[in-house]
Amino acid sequence: MAIDNGKLQEEEASSVTRFYNIILGWDYKQLTKENERKNRKDSKEKLNVVKNTYKDVDDYFETFEPLLFEEVKAQILQNKDGEEASVCKMRLVMECNEGEGFHFLLVTYEHEEDEYLAQNDLLLLSKEEVKGNSFPSSYGFAVVEHRQNNLLRLRMYLAEDIVQITKNTKSSRTKSFIQALSNMRSLITSSASPIDKRVFSLKLCGLSTIIREYIALRSVSSLPFKDLIFTAAEKSCGFGDEAWKISGPLNEFFNENLNKSQKEAIDVGLSRKSFVLIQGPPGTGKTQTILSILGAIMHATPARVQSKGTDHEVKRGIQMTIQEKYNHWGRASPWILGVNPRDAIMPEDGDDGFFPTSGNELKPEVVNASRKYRLRVLVCAPSNSALDEIVLRLLSSGLRDENAQTYTPKIVRIGLKAHHSVASVSLDHLVAQKRGSAIDKPKQGTTGTDIDSIRTAILEEAAIVFATLSFSGSALLAKSNRGFDVVIIDEAAQAVEPATLIPLATRCKQVFLVGDPKQLPATVISTVAQDSGYGTSMFERLQKAGYPVKMLKTQYRMHPEIRSFPSKQFYEGALEDGSDIEAQTTRDWHKYRCFGPFCFFDIHEGKESQHPGATGSRVNLDEVEFVLLIYHRLVTMYPELKSSSQLAIISPYNYQVKTFKDRFKEMFGTEAEKVVDINTVDGFQGREKDVAIFSCVRANENGQIGFLSNSRRMNVGITRAKSSVLVVGSAATLKSDPLWKNLIESAEQRNRLFKVSKPLNNFFSEENLETMKLTEDMEIPDAPLYEDESLPVAPYGGDDDFGDGDADQDDVAMAGED
């Protein structure tokens, strides 16, 4: 069915207009007052709670649109008083025009100071500089449209009419704000000279991602599988007739190299179901499964091909030598070699565009007759890091073709902040390569139009495109003449539903949602939206509604003693250990009970304290000191652990993480980042280390543990380690929560619960270590459960050279710490 691009663009423009009519009409002063109120029951009563299923598009939209705008409000106010608060900049209004109900301004732009400004950034424009909690006489929101002749083009909505979000919304403007808008309108439209039309701008936040989410939300009614999204039920489409199959060699390879649950996930995908949900618990080979799915769907063919009333098996091509394959790849991927695509012999429509499946690049007509066109796949993830992990794995291991031979397909990674390890396939790099080859040729220029043409050619020829969820809604992909047949979303449980909708608008026919609702959810800034279920991912919602989910069950990361608790607590005991995983994860330091594989250290005399600033984050200095003792003892006895690639320190609280980093910088200077990896729980999802030390922080008499009670945060925190996870916390405080009580009791049952008294360094004395040493013929010694005797003090020191330095890592921003 043909896609009416004109209609799509018209609908998108309508969505953008409505979005800015609402956002730009808000009163910043009123928003700050609402935010200061501790209890916002009045707002929550107007919001629909996210449900598992919906009657129709109106029911769906009336739920999500108000929640999305609540999130916008929270993002606007997020940095108001924080460390990242912006500074007011004075600008001159050079020109002002009206159109479509908006005012469009051209204001002065300072190149060096304004580099931080980007399209869709939201600004507060005012007559006077905004200082503290005082508000100027004239103010209003403005959004950055683009740069024009060394000027910034801004959009404002200064009409007195307010655009309501829903029919139940009863918003109104105060008289003071109406006057402020009137004053601003008079200022920017006056005939005075620019020097007399000074305004101040304050950057509040970027809106690019959330406006893409809004456009996707508004276009949900045009999706071919909208009914499935609403009802979580897929209509019977006779999948048996439409199912695809893979070649014998490729199927044999998967049978030999994948476990049962991974192979079943591929089979579900080949059934051609519109939505395929794959749950990947920690260490179950989720990324490998995604690569296998890519290999399968790139080379799948209809199970039977009808030809003149007779069923025929699909023809298979002959094998090529590796040199012949590389020769063909060079022609099929011209930008890699700097060749002009128009000068190259391009693969015929129907070829996969890489190593020819026909077995003969000179006879493309021998390509499988059942493949009418080359499949295109869009692979997305919520974050750059999650996306680049897949790209890197694909580059390092490749895919398998129908002959089960390894090859590297034509791929392109679009968007910002690509990791340096995948830069070779980034769009910018490929364009630069192509431009370089063009410059060397006579009569060839590199105008803006030429660059756009190069980008388009690269995207059109790539079989797999990688983009974050947000960037999949960029104009770059929207300009493409072709959509995508398949969309694969990794870490799908970490995305709010509107974000998941963005890549689905690319005309795809099949969607794979891969993730784990038992691990970290999406970050939602607004507590009002969070309480209404806005953080629920589409994956989780469909799963709750009963949509079938294929779970990967064999884990290849954790020692069985680490796997035991999360499997029972979060996955109903379904996780199995890969072959020889115990032998692969057993280490020399396991001869001591206190070094794993699974331990809980009860710092029963520790106390938490709160960050003096407005962040609300917490720190526990006793836990900091004890973790340093663990680290020192481990790396002194086992020097191979003195590496950030081997050992991690994890904590849910930013303040605790910062304190750890400061202490390690004091000890190791510029080498700090090399000797240990320190980050928040949120910053460690999807990663693994040999040893992980988890600092819980919370220790108080009231048994309050804040967001530490989040089961997903616990699951991620304790499943990062391959050989040893060492949990440090206050047993008395944590036992107030049923989940943590279960974990502590699990440690106790395994004789791996240690009570640590002050002075803390007594615990790792030579004498005490001997009591915790396992003999060769026993796994759990007959040793006291709690170690609280007064023992000689072990010297805290060593051969390390301590120095000064300022190396640090960026903290992962978290919302709602408490």
UniProtKB/Swiss-Prot annotation:
GO BP, sorted A to Z: embryo sac development; pollen tube guidance; pollen-pistil interaction
Domain UvrD-like helicase ATP-binding: from-to ranges: 259-559
Phenotype of null mutants: Defective in female gametophyte development and micropylar pollen tube guidance leading to zygotic lethality. Reduced size of nucleoli of polar nuclei in female gametophyte.
Class of the enzyme per the UniProt entry, highest EC level: hydrolase
Ranges annotated as biased composition (Acidic residues): 781-790, 798-818
UniProt similarity note: Belongs to the helicase family.
Name of the protein this chain belongs to: Probable helicase MAGATAMA 3
